[in-house]
């Protein structure tokens, strides 16, 4: 895989719990130059995950989640914000929610999209980062892997954390005990600090 190019479809082909911590420190890029390092993610796992939109099977809303990995699943939350997810493989209905970014470039454009938001809150939260990157319903189903879409995720050479911190997901009412949220240790760019959980580290199974 070359630097500064979209992650290939094979990167997303695994279970969302495998892909999620590997997305940490990757860079979300827009064609107009906005760039942000991924600092916080959550995995959602289809029929085995009551918190996933895809838990009860495919609907018109969740159709993208049941398609090829490497596509963007975009949905509306709280009646006011968009959120972005990378569709994964492994099993039907898997996706990784991108919860927070560290802004790297194109910050003027992010500020223009977000208004007078302080720098540290430009992209700390799924709705905030989607707004900062101008994401809306038209981006649902966008292919992150082609290099011709307006958004993609790339590897700039910064490896994922060797021991990403894991904890319960945020803003859900079901499956609240599952530690399927991962963050970059020590990052100042999180939607919410991670509660200390003894021995919590990245896990393929979520145990």
Swiss-Prot record:
InterPro entries hit by this protein: Formyl_transferase-like_C_sf (IPR011034), MPG (IPR003180), MPG_sf (IPR036995)
Enzyme class: hydrolase
Domain of life, source organism: Bacteria
Gene Ontology annotations of biological process type: base-excision repair
GO molecular function annotation: alkylbase DNA N-glycosylase activity; DNA binding
Disulphide bonds in the chain: none
Family: Belongs to the DNA glycosylase MPG family.
UniProt-recorded name of the protein: Putative 3-methyladenine DNA glycosylase
Source species: Xanthomonas campestris pv. campestris (strain ATCC 33913 / DSM 3586 / NCPPB 528 / LMG 568 / P 25)
Lineage: Bacteria, Pseudomonadati, Pseudomonadota, Gammaproteobacteria, Lysobacterales
